[in-house]
């Protein structure tokens, strides 16, 4: 069974209750919950929250496959990692594979998730993460303030059309098995492929 896990804290310090702020007429979290509920490979969507207001908001969506569950104060604290919430979930729920979905990715679609699960099904794949290809020239700055390019030779600057670019993790979703999550204590491990 494939489970989607969407952790949604009520205690954001930067933007209080950001996950239910309106984006295009719907609460922010609506867009990822809807995408997960429409994914053909996801059997159940768990939204884990410590907030009664978020719980009610998500329940009001009345979307198929969606269940709102509690989240401990410890796993919803300012210092808790997302992995701690995933591991807490894994201890209490039965599933084979998990897709962690960040509520703050409203442009995520069911088709994105479908592609992720298709990649995950390949024999040599242990985990999948969502990524975007970038075609930017990066620089780092040392302690003296001197800038140095990190991904190209400044004297042989490639044409953009000839530049291979690089992948950037975008944080929208991560897929792994329950067994690998428990073994590695991490959202991805083993042979990791991008989507």
Where are these regions (language model features)?
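N-terminal nucleotide-binding beta1-loop-alpha1 segment
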Residues: 1-16
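A structural signal for isolated positions on well-ordered beta-strands in alpha/beta enzyme cores
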Residues: 3-5, 44-46, 99, 128, ...
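Residues in the short beta-alpha loop(s) of Rossmann-like NAD(P)-binding domains
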Residues: 26, 49-52
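A short, N-terminal amphipathic alpha-helix
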Residues: 28-45, 56
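Short, high-confidence coil segments that cap the C-terminus of an alpha-helix
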Residues: 42, 95, 124-126
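Short phosphate-binding loop-to-helix
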Residues: 52-99, 108-115
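Conserved core of the sugar-phosphate nucleotidyltransferase
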Residues: 78-85, 106-193
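Active-site acidic Asp-centered loop
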Residues: 101-103
């Amino acid at each position: 069974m494939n489970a989607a896990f969407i952790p949604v804290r009520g205690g954001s310090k930067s933007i209080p209750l950001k996950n239910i702020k309106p984006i295009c007429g719907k609460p922010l979290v609506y867009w990822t919950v809807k995408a997960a509920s429409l994914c053909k490979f996801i059997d159940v969507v768990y939204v884990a929250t410590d907030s009664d207001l978020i719980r009610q908001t998500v329940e009001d969506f009345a979307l198929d496959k969606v269940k709102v569950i509690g989240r401990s104060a410890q796993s919803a604290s300012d210092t808790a990692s997302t992995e701690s919430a995933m591991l807490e979930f894994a201890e209490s729920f039965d599933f084979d594979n998990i897709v962690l979905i960040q509520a703050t990715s409203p442009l995520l679609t069911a088709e994105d998730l479908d592609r992720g699960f298709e990649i995950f099904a390949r024999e040599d794949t242990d985990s999948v993460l969502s990524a975007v290809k970038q075609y930017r020239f990066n620089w780092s700055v040392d302690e003296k303030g001197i800038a140095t390019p990190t991904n190209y030779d400044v004297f042989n600057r490639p044409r953009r059309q000839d530049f291979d670019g690089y992948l950037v993790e975008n944080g929208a979703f991560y897929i792994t098995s329950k067994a690998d999550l428990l073994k590695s204590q991490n959202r991805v491990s083993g042979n990791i492929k991008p989507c």
